[in-house]
Amino acid sequence: MEFENLTKEEMEQLQKIYDDTISFERKIGIIIPTIFAVIILVGLVGNALVVIVAFGRQMRNSTNTLIIGLAISDLMFLLLCVPFTAVDYAAPTWIFPEWTCSMINFFQHTSAYCSVWTLTLMALDRYLAVVYPVESMTLRTPRNTVIALCFIYIIIIASQIPVGRMHGIYVYDFIMEKRSTCAILTIATAEATPTMARTYFMTFNVFGYVLPLGISVVLYGLMLRKLWDMPRPGNSQSVGGRNLTNRDSGSSIRRRPEATAAKRKVTRLVLCVLITWALCWLPLNVCFFMSGLAYPEPLVISHGVIMVIVQIASQVLAYTNSCLNPILYALMSQSFREGFIRVMKMLINKLSRGRFCTNYRRSALRTELTHYNQTPAHPANTVVQVSNGERSSLLKDNSSSATSVQPLRTSIQAKKTKNIGRSKSTRSYNL
């Protein structure tokens, strides 16, 4: 950027704008990565617990298979997208290789599409379970669910390859310095026609939000009408021309309200997951839609700094959705809640047991060294016996000799070598 023709007042104004922008970016560069770090931590732990619990033998059904697929999509998003975006907020330039720009945006779009279409499959699964409970039993199996997920994921992956290839590192002038970021090059340089740009933005709006959400809303509407017509416990039913309550009817009728109540609980959980997703992704989709309408003029130019804050907040809200589903499962599903507690107890027991064993080995080693130091250099009738490094004892043996100290030295040296090797192997994983 040329500054020779600027007056002193213009240079002062430009310097003030630059200083204010840098100050704002520094604050954002601390706040947003911190929020993303919390999202990553909560999301990784929560979704990993969901996968572990849902893989249990007693939890194997079509709905939980879809929940596993949704958790895997969130894990992919948390591992391959959020960390790079956090660094991008903290650094003024793109510090990663160029291929990472394409990879991140490919996985970001893929995981977003996989999540929403998995939610649509969950709505279809609930619809079949409620409206056609008997007819759909052979169709709603974990195996068929995995086949449906793979079919949809293959289509999504194939369709998002061009989106990944469209992205690259865009270098631009920013007041007094050069910067770079990851963006769609044809849109960032305004080389794309308005039709091309709007096609990109609105394709995501339609196939990544409006269409799957619309299908899910229709399915839930039909499902809720069916659930509303189902009898509740204690209501009278007509059987054989006379009215019977659920208590004095046959066993199959008695069991029907309990099964209906269970279906209502599962349907309520899946519906809450869908509503949460829709609310979290709505602001970002609105920003996408407005960006398509405003192209080639950026929204920041037409709406000012307030639009920057809105775009950042909408992105943070969309990313937050990746860690909310496990919280909903824990709050609304007793089976998941009990599974989470069971897995956490198991992990805590293993960690505490491992810490106890480590402390026990250290104590045993100190005891051996103490006995060794207190033992005469040439004992006449004492043998130090060590059993696997776990305990030591002094046993009297008239047939022992001074050479019995050598195995102890060998054992201590072996322990030191083992600990050093363990330390090196552990350090090698700290990349």
From Swiss-Prot:
> Extracellular side: which ranges?
1-34, 88-101, 165-203, 290-298
Residues on Cytoplasmic side: 56-66, 125-143, 225-268, 320-431
The membrane topology of this protein is: Multi-pass membrane protein
InterPro entries the record matches: Galanin_rcpt, GPCR_Rhodpsn, GPCR_Rhodpsn_7TM
**Membrane-spanning segments:** 35-55, 67-87, 102-124, 144-164, 204-224, 269-289, 299-319
Q: Which stretches of sequence are listed as region Disordered?
A: 235-257, 393-431
Q: What tissue expression does the UniProt record report for this protein?
A: Exclusively expressed in the AIB interneuron.
Q: Which UniProt keywords apply?
A: Cell membrane, Disulfide bond, G-protein coupled receptor, Glycoprotein, Membrane, Receptor, Transducer, Transmembrane, Transmembrane helix
Functional note: Neuropeptide that controls movement such as roaming, foraging and backwards locomotion or 'reversals' in response to environmental cues such as food availability or volatile odorants such as octanol. Antagonizes AIB interneuron activity to control bacterial colonization and may negatively regulate the expression of immunity-related genes such as pqm-1 and dod-22 in response to infection by P.aeruginosa.
* PANTHER family according to UniProt: GALANIN-LIKE G-PROTEIN COUPLED RECEPTOR NPR-9, LEUCOKININ RECEPTOR-RELATED
The name of this protein is: Galanin-like G-protein coupled receptor npr-9
Classification lineage = Eukaryota, Metazoa, Ecdysozoa, Nematoda, Chromadorea
The gene it comes from is npr-9
